[in-house]
């Protein structure tokens, strides 16, 4: 292990007051901060890139146990290191002097908070799953090792990864390509490899989302999902990765799911509106203590998914949510209350006072508080002792070996689902018309094809974001070959941040909802014109069942990340890999990790 037993181990053994214990059980976000601003907290969009004195003082005064960083907090290497060092300095000023858990969602692929030009983000879990039949857990290990080393160099000591949800529901709006596979055994093996690699690189891992978020059609950011599996199916599918990884190599943390599982716990809780409802897993003693700790034997630290998500916040106020969570036996409440300005600091003070009152009146269990604190303190003795170094970070983030690995994974994942003699692109197919979800993806694939083609290609592109059907039809008529791509389902809140982004996503989703019908109509037109057509699934491959029958060939990439670098060039490892396969420079070696009707 690369963790260094820190000098904080002694501090961890010093008895803490109940107030300090409560603070240690909180992980706050400071995504935005507007200081003295009088605007409503929810309207604040000033990125917090340096730690203001009042937030430093709050961390010290309340012995806050952790902080989670978002894309707004991590803008460049020097700034990130300055921020993580400042956060740890604030923790050092607390009475306990326990270090902070500094966490981030850097799963890779669609969920990656650090600028893709700086850090290596890779093409995500489902692309790793596509390599499993030929490569086993090689890419899972190498990718987690690279991400772990990059985070460690920045002073980030917890990665909320890997996702070990088994994506058995094609309509899952929030997991889909964040899952390795629909096969629980494959998910287990790849998740285990990542846990070992993250922690060997000096970063605590957090398996998520317990007891499983793979068979839902509701995103817990926007609603409360319910899974009605019987206990046998839960054991064989949802719980299997957690159970096996806990036995083989227990992760530092496990994250909860805001999901109702009646077969695991059908007891009721009265929410803040006075209504009775089945307990979400996050608030279930039966699930989080009896099942996870007593049956599965997990002795590490548990952390909630963000408590500001609608799956919790629509039903419980911050104090009630925290009390129910702690009484379920969960160790850390993640993002229980937003702090966006000085007025919110006052609100946080009231929140802490109410938690203290809950202890005094036995609404909170003192014995559970002490047990939880012992687990947190024990885990914190594993945190690295030294401060982050800019020189080490500069030589680690996005270094050539990590970029090569990123490109290798993208190529190894490309899956040929169908090919009726269309691929590789024939020499007589010189005029190619692309149909892409937006202009950036047009540019990315155009650039990749032009870069790697030995022949002079004439390329044009229809962006489905805004197009004239007559112009698109003319371009299709003139083309020797049609290459169409789509990404489904649309982005979820977790991919670009969290609950602060839900409104933006709803507006974006309205525009995206018309794209499948538009693409289908254009492919049907191309078919009527007798054109050779290639369809590329850029995300979850289930959409192949819709567009595959209209195409002569089908590829899946599981990723559509587009990077715009400082030279304003548009690129992305998935597009480079696709171009190489389309042009016959490389073979498609991947396999579908999920069942697709085609």
From Swiss-Prot:
Thermal dependence: Optimum temperature is 37 degrees Celsius.
InterPro entries: Glyco_hydro_3_AS, Glyco_hydro_3_C_sf, Glyco_hydro_3_N, Glyco_hydro_3_N_sf, Glycoside_hydrolase_SF, NagZ_Beta-hexosaminidase
Keywords assigned: Glycosidase, Hydrolase, Signal
EC number: 3.2.1.52
Pfam family, one: Glyco_hydro_3
Gene3D superfamilies in the record: Glycoside hydrolase family 3 C-terminal domain, Glycoside hydrolase, family 3, N-terminal domain
One Gene Ontology molecular-function label: beta-N-acetylhexosaminidase activity
pH profile of the protein: Optimum pH is 7.5.
Keyword Signal among record annotations: yes
PROSITE patterns: GLYCOSYL_HYDROL_F3
Catalyzed reactions: Hydrolysis of terminal non-reducing N-acetyl-D-hexosamine residues in N-acetyl-beta-D-hexosaminides
Signal peptide start and end residues: 1-11
Any one GO BP annotation for this protein: peptidoglycan turnover
Active site: 305
UniProt KW Signal keyword: yes
Top-level class of the enzyme under EC nomenclature: hydrolase
Task performed by this protein: Most active towards p-nitrophenyl-N-acetyl-beta-D-glucosaminide(PNP-beta-GlcNAc) and diacetylchitobiose.
Entry similarity comment: Belongs to the glycosyl hydrolase 3 family.
Annotated protein name in UniProt: Beta-hexosaminidase A
Organism expressing this protein natively: Pseudoalteromonas piscicida
Protein encoded by which gene: cht60
């Amino acid at each position: 292990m690369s963790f260094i037993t820190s000098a904080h181990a002694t501090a961890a053994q010093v008895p803490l007051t109940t107030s300090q214990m409560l603070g240690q059980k909180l992980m706050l976000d400071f995504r935005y901060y507007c200081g003295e601003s009088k605007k409503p907290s929810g309207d604040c969009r000033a990125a917090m890139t340096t730690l203001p004195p009042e937030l430093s003082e709050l961390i010290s005064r309340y012995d806050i146990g952790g902080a989670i960083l978002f894309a707004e907090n991590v803008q460049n290497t020097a700034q990130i290191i300055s921020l993580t060092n400042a956060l740890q300095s604030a923790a050092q000023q607390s009475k306990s002097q326990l270090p902070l858990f500094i966490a981030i969602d850097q799963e890779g692929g669609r969920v990656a908070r650090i600028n893709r030009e700086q850090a290596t983000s890779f093409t995500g879990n489902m692309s790793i799953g596509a390599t499993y039949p030929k490569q086993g857990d090689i890419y899972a290990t190498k990718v987690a090792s690279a991400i772990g080393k990059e985070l460690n160099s920045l002073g980030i000591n917890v990665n909320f990864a890997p996702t070990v949800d088994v994506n058995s529901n094609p309509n899952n709006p929030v997991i889909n390509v964040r899952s390795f596979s629909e096969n629980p055994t494959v998910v287990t093996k790849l998740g285990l490899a990542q846990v070992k690699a993250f922690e060997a690189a000096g970063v605590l891992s957090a398996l998520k989302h317990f007891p499983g978020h793979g068979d839902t059609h509701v995103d817990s950011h926007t609603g409360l999902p319910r899974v009605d599996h019987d206990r046998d199916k839960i054991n064989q599918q949802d719980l299997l990765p957690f159970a096996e990884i806990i036995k083989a190599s227990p992760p530092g943390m496990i994250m909860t799911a805001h999901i109702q599982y009646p077969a695991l716990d059908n007891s009721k809780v009265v929410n803040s509106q006075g209504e009775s409802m089945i307990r979400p897993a996050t608030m279930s003693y039966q699930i989080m203590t009896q099942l996870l700790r007593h049956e599965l034997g997990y002795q590490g630290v548990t952390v909630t998914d963000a408590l500001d998500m609608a799956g919790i916040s629509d039903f419980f106020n911050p104090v009630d949510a925290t009390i129910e969570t702690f009484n379920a036996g969960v160790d850390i409440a993640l993002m229980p209350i937003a702090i966006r300005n000085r007025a919110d600091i006052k609100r946080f003070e009231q929140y802490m006072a109410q938690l203290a009152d809950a202890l005094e009146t036995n609404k909170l269990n003192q014995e559970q508080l002490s047990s939880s604190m012992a687990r947190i303190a024990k885990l914190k003795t594993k945190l690295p002792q030294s401060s982050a170094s800019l020189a080490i970070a500069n030589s680690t983030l996005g270094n050539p070996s990590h970029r090569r690995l990123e490109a290798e994974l993208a190529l190894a994942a490309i899956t040929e689902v169908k090919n009726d003699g269309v691929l590789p692109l024939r020499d007589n197919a010189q005029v190619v018309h692309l149909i892409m979800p937006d202009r950036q993806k047009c540019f990315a694939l155009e650039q990749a094809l032009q870069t790697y083609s030995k022949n002079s290609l004439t390329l044009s592109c229809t962006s489905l974001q805004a197009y004239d059907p007559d112009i698109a039809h003319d371009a299709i008529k003139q083309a020797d070959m049609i290459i169409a791509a789509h990404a489904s389902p649309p982005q979820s809140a977790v991919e670009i941040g969290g609950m602060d982004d839900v409104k933006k996503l709803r507006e974006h989703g309205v525009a995206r909802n018309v794209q499948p019908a538009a693409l289908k109509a254009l492919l049907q037109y191309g078919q009527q014109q007798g054109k050779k057509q290639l369809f590329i699934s850029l995300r979850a491959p289930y959409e192949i069942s819709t567009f595959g029958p209209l195409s002569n060939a089908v590829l899946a990439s599981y990723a559509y990340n587009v990077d715009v670098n400082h030279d304003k060039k548009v690129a992305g490892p998935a597009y480079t890999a696709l171009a190489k396969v389309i042009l016959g420079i490389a073979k498609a070696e991947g396999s579908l990790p999920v069942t697709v009707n085609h």
